[in-house]
């Protein structure tokens, strides 16, 4: 194998590895921040103590997720300079300011109010504390806005010109509000809420299966399933519109996702399953539904979709990868809709908290939000290849002039460190979830912490328990 391409493959694998670890933590923290804000609002309005109990419980898990997200985000951003210097030199005039806006608005907002949210109980008034929690939740949404603006510009670039081999911005409004941005923003934001809803529902299911029937456990289980009932179908509708937008601006990606090689007139079938073969230029063992591809992607019975053979081989995404990553995402999405629908039926029959079979299903579905999220990102990023800025700069042009050995050494270091550090973080969150919210007869000690060895100076300080004692 050519050394340069070997280094490119390793650099891509390394970035995929680090960004996959990173995205799961912000996704969870985005959803949990809003969930905690709603819980605190309900506590202020009703005065019911279990809302505050749930606030305190989920704030601990949010603190760990937020801390992990910040650390992994910093490491990921360094790779733009170490492994992707070509991209930074070419497009840094667009992506750099967008990331700066994210730090100057969202991160400063989150960092400024996070301490009050985590450590301000009984230090500030309840309304001031709720205001801080609300600001943190808003900050996570603003962060999503800027990150998705940058990523969407790489998918559907506009508002620039190339001068002396570098991107020069000419219209920041066009750059930020590029053609795919609204669809990606709503798709990702709702995905984050669904991720959090599934985690909350799974945690509630675990404690219901263990015999707890206190109001706090029942309430978080119920709230998560109500949210899922609303958002899972909405996500499917947004995904449909996102697909139509992608067909317009990235038709090769759609052809790869659908495993379509030929441009068929009179209606395009949908390949439900199959194994795309990039060398043979065919999808083996395809199970086809006539006209359904046209109906879904063009909303017409005989709409035309260009096949992959319409594009040069060097411009084709890897259909084998995106074909299956997309189906994993969609399949899990239907399972989420099914979970929410069953919950609604059980609720009507008064058996939501008594059906152990359903609770096991909800527990099993807990991690699927993360899996679906990662599958979706694999689809959108692998489907963009071979471009890093679609139609403008190839990924091979973006990589730093490194040897395969250099990239492989850093890759091994990342794998070891990430599994140790983030494995510990995930284990810690699972232990906290297993412990559950405080029982009604065990009051929270939310007095200001004056211990000299437990100064509230970082998110992890919000979690009093040691791993060994949870």
What role is predicted for each listed range?
Residues 1-470:
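Polytopic transmembrane helical bundles with strong interfacial aromatic enrichment
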